[in-house]
Regions:
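PRPP-associated nucleotide enzymes
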Residues: 1-5, 9-176
Length: 176
């Protein structure tokens, strides 16, 4: 299957571990012509239009080579962040329904992702969702001491991690 974007046609298999893992999806390539949920295709187009998704030859943080690169830090407007949160909320709802309690965004780019996704999830599905994020450095003063920002997960909480890109899982390992 091919995914058409403004800057050319890219095989979905190329995007499988990048774009689709951004949404936290277990996506398998489908035969040519099979329907893709509209929001997934729209999300890829949105990333290209927002100049967030680049095509070329890139060395990722993990050391892997990739024919594309996604920089979530390039979402710079309120309307872009609103749409981004909606795409993430749709993907989470498709994969988990309402069977989660907390959205966790690892520092640093995951922080705004958790916030905009929590807002969008409430707007789209009516569920009040808590969010939390970690700090790379523990805070030792004020009311919010420690490594967490926002809600502090409790035993039994079901947590969904939202992140811009996952290639090796290193940031998941770095998060406690």
């Amino acid at each position: 299957m091919q995914v058409r974007v403004d800057k050319g046609t890219v095989p979905l298999s190329t995007l499988r571990w990048g774009i689709c893992s951004i949404l936290g999806l277990n996506v398998q390539t489908t035969p040519e012509g099979s329907p893709m949920e509209a929001y997934k295709s729209e999300f890829i187009k949105f990333m290209v239009e927002s100049d967030v998704l680049k095509f070329g030859s890139f060395t990722l943080k993990s050391g892997r080579q990739s024919p594309f690169f996604m920089n979530a830090g390039a979402y710079v407007t309120g309307s872009q962040l609103k749409r981004l949160g909606e795409y993430y909320a749709q993907a989470i709802h498709d994969n988990f329904g309402d069977d989660f309690d907390v959205l966790f965004g690892p520092a640093y780019k995951g922080i705004p992702l958790a916030v905009v996704t929590a807002i969008a999830y409430h707007e789209l599905y009516g569920k009040e969702v808590k969010y939390c994020c970690d700090r790379k450095e523990a805070k030792d003063h004020g009311a919010d001491k420690g490594n967490l920002l926002g809600y502090e997960p409790q035993d039994g909480d079901r947590v969904v991690m939202v992140e811009d890109v996952t290639t090796s899982g290193k940031s998941i390992d770095e998060t406690y």
